């Protein structure tokens, strides 16, 4: 595949290398170039042309051991990765190489990681609800089939656990294919996820692509595109409804900001790259539904210092159909998943899409929780006795609703000792409607904590 163009390394600064070619043979932007390093082949991607004859490139592997004067060979094409059924059950790196110590993948087809987003004619608007079996998500911030969902949260509030539960539920209940792109997260989590998928039997329906924290920024910047390319194949060639999980989209931005200064760009707000919105758009616009199939994407978004106005999460917000916000205050109450029902929202929580009953119950839940939040200052200063009877009832119901929003997860069984629960949407709506209507005012609050359906809460209270 190589064009035979040979260049020479003239400068190496961390993850960025400059390669000099003869002026008429300089490789195109985004071309892959290979360099034979002491520890194997190093692939770099052309990011800029400097002068007439120099290509400034970003490395996909560590540049340790590279020296000036080494030969670099132009492949004449962007990075291409294997796609198709052969990729299921395997772990890949950014270059599409197998990293699970298994035998190499013999895919019938390879595709470049840089592609145009589908045109307007090819796209299809998503209005259908995608059931996850997680009560708080399905009720308050329902996901659209073929939509984009963001999981926002600081460090350690449960973003990755929620993603793992979604993978588990969707593989078991919907039998759909998933692609998981691990972008700049912990190697241990990637390893745990792989082994849990083997144990739960969902590995055969999933392709995994990892570029962990210890990888150079070039790999972390491009690994999301590698996963997306694999998902696009299932959507376009096989007409599948694919799930694309990205954990963590913030690390994609972070990697871009690491190489941006080395590429000589002036930093923008808070030190981020000036091309932040463009880079994010190039990735997000390819995640969409077409007339052939859909890609439903769930993206964990790390929020630096819990500040939602930071440019990285703020830029991500613009692309999302639903946001699931994880709150430290709720996790401190011991309620998991720690989803904030007042901060989370969805574009499809609309009577025309979800139906009148679902809409009214969801808004009723938010109303009662909002009133409880307003009353908390009064309760803290004066105590419950100073509230009117109506407010006392609101608080009692709000506390039951708050606890009923918790749920035991399948993927956390080994830590919690509680069996996981999948709750159908109809059961979720019925349960919250009955609590709001006061049918369960006689049950103790503890009965609602970590149960599936409302019938289980009643059963738990009766066992006492």
From Swiss-Prot:
It catalyses: ATP + H2O + 4 H(+)(in) = ADP + phosphate + 5 H(+)(out). ATP binds at residues 153-160. GO terms for molecular function: ATP binding; ATP hydrolysis activity; proton-transporting ATP synthase activity, rotational mechanism. It is an enzyme of class 7 (translocase). Signal peptide: none annotated. One of its GO terms (cellular component) is plasma membrane. The keyword Zinc does not apply. It is a peripheral membrane protein. Its main location: membrane. Produces ATP from ADP in the presence of a proton gradient across the membrane. The catalytic sites are hosted primarily by the beta subunits. NCBIfam families: atpD. This is ATP synthase subunit beta. It comes from Alkaliphilus metalliredigens (strain QYMF). The gene is atpD.
